């Protein structure tokens, strides 16, 4: 669950040291290259808003697993990218996949752990969410010291594979049926609070 909650920070911050290299590799202006981050964040935000609703309807664990498969596919597409458009398509897939992690990992924790264990689990998830943005750029720079820029996306792909292997199924979590009222969570108050 900690890995699931951390994937968005990893995907956002690990590529920061790569941006100048991407500009040279694709012979593009810097504003276009910055779409790899700004575009990611826009799609990621929309994905977060929808993932909780979809998770309630289809099952949180199922949606979380599907989202990491999307993130894996996006990471591999970025790894193989030979054009900026291919890279941006991969980043879009990554963003859609990353959106479910922070939302559903906490929801699954609440359904899986006892109240005492839940406090510890949520504390660990929050700590990881704070630490990963600090470590990710350093990890990206370290990778660039030995490998080419696209290997950063291979590391992200491996991260998603590890997260899938450490699925919450191992915690004994089973998706529960959604309450009938869960489909009505998008209310005027919700929209006003979001804005």
Task: For the regions a language model picked out, list residue spans one by one.
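Residue-level signature of mid-helix packing/kink "hotspots" within the transmembrane helices
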Residues: 13, 41-49, 133-134
